[in-house]
């Protein structure tokens, strides 16, 4: 963590960086604070620890070194505060010590830089006990060595006592009357304690306060000085910005509940098997139904009350969109969705239609949109801008009109499918996998429905993905052939993939499955393996199989696109 700050960059920061109409030059305030003044502000609730900071993680030894630096007159860096009337999500306690609330309507100073140092000083002053990894740490147990010898001792302040030496607790030095030490120690040692107390309480802590900066700029300041330029995410900023204790709204907790559910609320992303949906997508869903715009700067303009009011409507629209994808499009898991951005557009659609069941015509057009997005790799760049355009497509569908698409965007060439390498991160491949999932593929051996799961679909080697012509078979028998083509991929259960097929030739394992599954021909149809492709597989002709299956896939995709 940096302990200093380039105030030049701060003085040049303007509100123009945030969504405001009239840029105003912002100027930080530099001043010193004494120990007593600093901790009086904490005890009165004026200084707070925002939750986008790390928890208190310093070891006792680090805290001892900090006190040691103060006693030796070393600089310990600058503390930076953001003074505002914004109510942010902040830590309520340090260890077992409860922090006071800020009086309603008062300014509060959030620590942007120096949280670990200030918390260390406060923990020592209060004698706080903290439980960490099952071990209790008592900050009263940081000591000044009264027999300190600069020639042999590295530090004045230590966490472990040596036999035969005199020590005094830093906590006691700060909190007990001086008379106590004159009664307990020799005159010389008591005078030492008095000198140490004076050094601590009279130390000038360098502080910079940025007052009434917009939250977006305060967060940018935090990012630049604390994380090497790594910006806080929009979600982290909105967690801080939308926190409302009176309404019991904590965005971080609400997102966890949305993802994992609770004992009272069973509907959640995990139960729907859409648990891979990120915080950023959820933020964009809120912005979509609130503003019909999803840029980061748009999200940051949403007021706390508006965001909270739109949280439940967003959830309703989101789950209606997920239900549509699962039931109408038959895509059972989020891992197969070409781009999560389609959820934002669909949530927008269902919010605008009050989550009503779409008409048959609307279903066809929404399905067309879904496949158009993936097959044209629509969100490969400029997602935020393109989503705004896609809301217009949703508006057209709502009003019974056909969205505008270029003719070339509604045609799939089977040759491209023949040549496309399989990748779980490729939207084009994912669209084909969605098509395969739509067929409700059956198990080769039993004709039972294949159960798909996000955990088995993450990477190309995951259990649900099966190379119809096994990779090991091709490597041993046809080294010149590429097994990793999308047209060679089927969705089957992991057990059959690993234990029943292995590296067998298709002709061999299909013959075995046929003895136990009299419906194997129909089973293979659910994988878009039509008669011509099946004949090629039964004669182990990989080239013809890929060609014929690519044609079957292209035909089915073109039906979706021409809805």
Model-assigned labels for residue ranges:
Residues 32, 60-64, 115, 212-215, ...:
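Conserved structured core elements
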């Amino acid at each position: 963590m940096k302990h200093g700050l380039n105030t030049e960059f701060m003085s040049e920061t303007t509100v123009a960086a945030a969504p405001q109409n009239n840029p105003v030059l912002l100027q930080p305030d530099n001043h010193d604070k004494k120990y007593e003044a600093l901790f009086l502000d904490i005890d009165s609730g004026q200084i707070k620890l925002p939750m986008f900071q790390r928890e208190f993680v310093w070891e006792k030894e680090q805290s001892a070194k900090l006190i040691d630096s103060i006693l030796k007159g070393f600089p310990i860096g600058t503390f930076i505060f953001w003074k505002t009337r914004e109510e942010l999500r902040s830590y309520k306690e340090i260890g077992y010590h409860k922090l006071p609330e800020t009086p309603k309507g008062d300014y509060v100073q959030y620590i942007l830089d120096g949280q670990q140092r200030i918390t260390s000083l406060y923990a020592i002053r209060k004698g706080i006990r903290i439980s960490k990894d099952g071990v209790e740490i008592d900050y009263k147990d940081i000591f000044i060595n009264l027999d300190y010898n600069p020639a042999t001792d590295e530090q004045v302040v230590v966490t472990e006592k040596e036999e035969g030496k005199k020590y005094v607790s830093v906590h006691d030095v700060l909190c007990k009357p001086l008379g106590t030490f004159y009664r307990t120690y020799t005159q010389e040692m008591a005078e030492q304690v008095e000198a140490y107390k004076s050094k601590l309480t009279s130390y000038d802590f360098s502080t910079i306060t940025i007052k009434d900066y917009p939250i977006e700029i305060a967060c940018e300041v935090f990012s630049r000085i604390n994380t090497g330029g790594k910006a806080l995410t929009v979600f982290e900023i909105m967690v801080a910005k939308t926190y409302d204790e009176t309404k019991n709204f904590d965005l971080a907790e609400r997102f966890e509940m949305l993802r994992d559910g609770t004992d009272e609320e069973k509907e959640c992303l995990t139960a729907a098997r859409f648990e891979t949906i990120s915080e950023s997508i959820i933020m964009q869903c809120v912005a979509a139904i609130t503003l019909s715009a999803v840029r980061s700067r748009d999200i940051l303009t949403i007021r706390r009350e508006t965001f909270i009011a739109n949280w439940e409507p967003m959830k309703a629209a989101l789950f209606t969109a997920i239900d549509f994808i699962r039931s109408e499009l038959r895509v059972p898991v989020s891992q197969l969705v070409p781009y999560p951005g389609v959820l934002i557009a669909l949530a927008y659609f269902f919010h605008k239609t009050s989550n009503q069941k779409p008409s048959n015509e609307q279903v066809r057009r929404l399905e067309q949109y879904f496949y158009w997005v993936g097959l044209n790799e629509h969100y490969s760049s400029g997602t935020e801008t393109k989503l705004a355009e896609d809301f217009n497509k949703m508006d057209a569908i709502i009003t019974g009109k056909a969205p505008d698409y270029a003719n070339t965007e509604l045609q799939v060439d089977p040759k491209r499918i023949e040549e496309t390498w399989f990748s779980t991160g490729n939207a084009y491949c994912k669209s084909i996998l969605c098509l395969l999932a739509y067929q409700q593929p059956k198990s080769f051996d039993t004709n039972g429905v294949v159960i798909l799961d996000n955990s088995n679909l993450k990477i190309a080697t995951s259990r649900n993905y099966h190379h119809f012509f096994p990779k090991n078979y091709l490597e041993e028998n046809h080294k010149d052939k590429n097994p990793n083509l999308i047209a060679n991929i089927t969705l089957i259960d992991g057990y059959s993939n690993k234990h029943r097929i292995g590296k067998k030739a298709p002709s061999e394992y299909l013959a075995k499955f046929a003895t136990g599954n009299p419906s194997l021909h129909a089973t293979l149809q659910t994988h878009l393996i039509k008669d011509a492709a099946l004949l090629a597989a039964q004669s182990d002709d990989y080239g013809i199989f890929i060609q014929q299956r690519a044609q079957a896939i292209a035909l089915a995709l073109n039906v979706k696109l021409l809805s």
